[in-house]
From Swiss-Prot:
Substrate binds at K66, N111, R112, M113, G114, F115, N172, N177, N246, T247. PANTHER family: DIHYDROOROTATE DEHYDROGENASE (QUINONE), MITOCHONDRIAL, DIHYDROOROTATE DEHYDROGENASE (QUINONE), MITOCHONDRIAL-RELATED. GO terms for biological process: 'de novo' pyrimidine nucleobase biosynthetic process; 'de novo' UMP biosynthetic process. CDD domains: DHOD_2_like. Pathway: Pyrimidine metabolism; UMP biosynthesis via de novo pathway; orotate from (S)-dihydroorotate (quinone route): step 1/1. This is Dihydroorotate dehydrogenase (quinone). Monomer. The keyword Ribonucleoprotein does not apply. FMN binds at A62, G63, L64, D65, K66, T86, N139, N172, K217, T245, G268, G297, F318, S319. It catalyses: (S)-dihydroorotate + a quinone = orotate + a quinol. GO terms for cellular component: cytoplasm; plasma membrane. It comes from Photorhabdus laumondii subsp. laumondii (strain DSM 15139 / CIP 105565 / TT01). The gene is pyrD. NCBIfam families: PRK05286.1-1, PRK05286.1-2, PRK05286.1-4, PRK05286.2-5, pyrD_sub2. Belongs to the dihydroorotate dehydrogenase family. Type 2 subfamily.
């Protein structure tokens, strides 16, 4: 692969334009002889987690393929699982542009995308068309114009539609770019949401005779006490997995760098240490009762190993993939 050359060209463009251009090309070559240029031979390293069998422990994090447009392309690159979304019940445009910024010196990204997506029905059609044989996770959220007190209704609508097509479902309550969303991580609001989610999961299990695990994605900007409370809620409600972590609002990590004052969530290398520490603390509180999918700043084999040593059973990449390309998948999976 010639990703360094492609990256040089893409990084001359606005980040969102570069993303759209890349996706157009991936869709164009998938299923043709030109797929050879993205296909990689990856070691098979099966992992069982949440009752599912994964080809290898490295997945694509949610947010890159929001609508499930390029599932087969990412599968060809060697991901052991692919998480698509965040998707909402209705299509929405997201926040105003520009809304995505590269912090190149720190290999970070700041985004305030705002759950831009074409809606859950469109995503389901894309999943049905995909030929990828690995686990597909579907990450769900609420529409921006849905009041937060009615947010759980949006999650239940999405669950109804995606359940028969999902390998697992991720409840995203930790994006900083949807007003009020992170309040669902705490106290009664979290318990109320998780209770409704588990009831819906039980109904759908009976309907489809299939158990689809549910994971909850949390933020890195949590105190130790908040992590303890979240872990307790996850255990009490028999949630199947925890994904740690989403992006951070702490911009001190990139102070003085270009775009460091932009609003939105910071991802990539700057969040690496904090994410790993959250995984370590969460692992201690969950006491092996619930597996953790570790994400946040994984940009090397060493960073991947640190996440697993901290307590992650599976890991995901996003920003590291943008900066290092498909070779990062091969480096991690073949040597982990």
């Amino acid at each position: 692969m010639c990703y360094p050359l492609a990256r040089k060209a893409l990084f001359q463009l606005d980040p969102e334009h570069a993303h759209e251009l890349t996706f157009r090309q991936l869709k164009r070559i998938t299923g043709t002889p030109f797929e050879f240029f993205i296909r990689q031979s990856i070691a098979t390293k099966p992992v069982t987690c949440m009752g599912l069998s994964f080809k290898n422990p490295l997945g694509l994090a949610a947010g890159l393929d929001k609508d499930g447009d390029c599932i087969d392309a990412f599968g060809a690159m060697g991901f052991g699982f692919i998480e698509i979304g965040t998707v909402t019940p209705r299509a929405q445009a997201g926040n105003d542009k520009p809304r995505l910024f590269r912090i190149v010196e720190a290999e970070g990204l700041i985004n305030r995308m705002g759950f831009n997506n074409l809606g859950v029905d469109n995503l389901v059609e894309n999943v049905k068309k995909a030929k990828y044989g690995g686990v597909i996770g579907i990450n769900i959220g609420k529409n921006k114009d849905t009041p937060v007190e009615h947010g759980k209704d949006d999650y239940l609508i999405c669950m109804d539609k995606i359940y028969p097509h999902a390998g697992y479902i991720t409840i995203n309550i930790s994006s900083p770019n949807t007003p009020g969303l992170r309040t669902l991580q705490y106290g009664e609001a979290l318990d109320d949401l998780l209770s409704a989610i588990k009831n819906k999961q039980g109904e759908l299990q009976q309907k489809y005779q299939k158990y689809v695990p549910v994971a909850v994605k949390i933020a890195p900007d949590l105190s130790e006490e908040e992590l303890i409370q979240i872990a307790d809620s996850l255990i009490r409600h028999n949630i199947d997995g925890a994904i740690a972590t989403n992006t951070t609002l702490d911009k001190r990590l990139v102070e003085g760098l270009n775009y460091c004052q932009q609003a939105g969530g910071l991802s990539g290398r700057p969040v690496q240490l904090r994410s790993t520490e959250v995984i370590r603390q969460l692992s201690q509180e969950l006491r092996d009762k619930i597996p953790i999918i570790g994400v946040g700043g994984i940009d090397s084999l060493t960073a991947a190993r640190e996440k697993i040593a901290a307590g992650a059973s599976l890991i995901q990449i996003f920003s590291g993939f943008i900066y290092h390309g498909p070779k990062l998948i091969k480096d991690i999976v073949n040597h982990i």
